Amino acid sequence: KYEQTKVLMVPNKNYHGKKVNLDRLEIVYIDDVSTKMMEYEQGNIDMCDLSTSLLDQYKDSDLKDEITQVTPLGTYFLSIKDTDPVLSNKAVREAISLAINRKELCNTVLNGAAQPASSFLNPGVPGHDDKLKAYEHNVTKAKKVLADAGISNPTFTCKVRQNEEKIATALQAYLKEAGITMNVETIDAGIWSSARAAGELQATIVGWFPLYADADNQMYTYYYSENAVGKGVFYNNPEFDSLMKEARESTDSDKRVELYKKADYILSREDYGTIPLYYGKLQFVAKPYVKNAKLGNLIYHLYNIDIDLSKK
């Protein structure tokens, strides 16, 4: 049964497999993250996601043992229009990356629910280079890169949705220290989506999650030249495209991994065609009597979920 604010699921009596554990499963939609946790604390819901913005409030509370944290396959990054008059200059893109304090961003702004990025590919995706360290934070070097290129006070606008506003504001402060002006504008999600597809955004913040652990699904879908146009980034490097195409056509898994490592390095460390920020973590809370609660790559796995009535 579906209603605007919830979905009620009951067992299918004709299902061919084993009997399910629960007599009913109710999924309730609650937009406000604080209201959602209030409902959880009052016992009106048995499990729910815990927003990163509230993690600091709950991680040392009485609910700390009810929190489960997972790392999905995605990467959060500063998505930039590589053909923009300001951002088309590689020196500007490199300086932006150097100016960002990813460690502080993860520990303070994101309350520890993130890991500083070292490449575009997530560590859980074959093709991620585990030997790479997190991107360097060096404001002095960022200023020198700009000075050597004869650039002073580069200015651009980063338009974001409300969820990314806090991140954008932090980036704005980091870039200011290096003499880079990033104006931040928060826009409606629908307008954002249309503007990105039309290539109207100089820069924005994106979390990009592959549907499964394969670099083709994470990197080809966003930065292969034909796809990059629709994402509003217009990245175009024939060498990168060639590596991606070769990896797509290969059936040798080890070879594919090496090809993706090279492609990622070109994209995110030679061209700075993208500015990876962090690998986000997700968390949810579940009552002690909830059994087999799992969260995979952005998806709750509910097929084995059960309730231990002796603990309720």
Language-model features: where?
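The feature preferentially marks the first beta-strand/turn patch immediately downstream
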Residues: K1-V10, V257-E258, L298-K312
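Ligand/substrate-recognition segments at binding pockets and active sites
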Residues: E3, P126, A147-L211, Y279-L282
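Append "and occasionally in soluble cytosolic enzymes with long acidic Gly/Pro-rich linkers
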Residues: L8, S88-A173, E177-A178, K262, ...
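Ligand-site clamp/hinge motif
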Residues: N12-Y58, T181
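Short, solvent-exposed loop/beta-turn-alpha elements that line the ligand-binding surface or hinge
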Residues: G17-L22, Y58-T71, S79-K90, P123-K144, ...
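Short, hydrophobic alpha-helical packing/hinge segments within bilobed ligand-binding/sensory domains
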Residues: K36-M37, I45, L54-L55, V92, ...
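Paired acidic/hydrophobic, glycine-rich loop segments that form the ligand-binding mouth/hinge
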Residues: I45-S51, Q202-G207, P276
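A ligand-binding cleft/hinge motif common to bilobed small-molecule-binding domains
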Residues: S51-D62, P210-A215
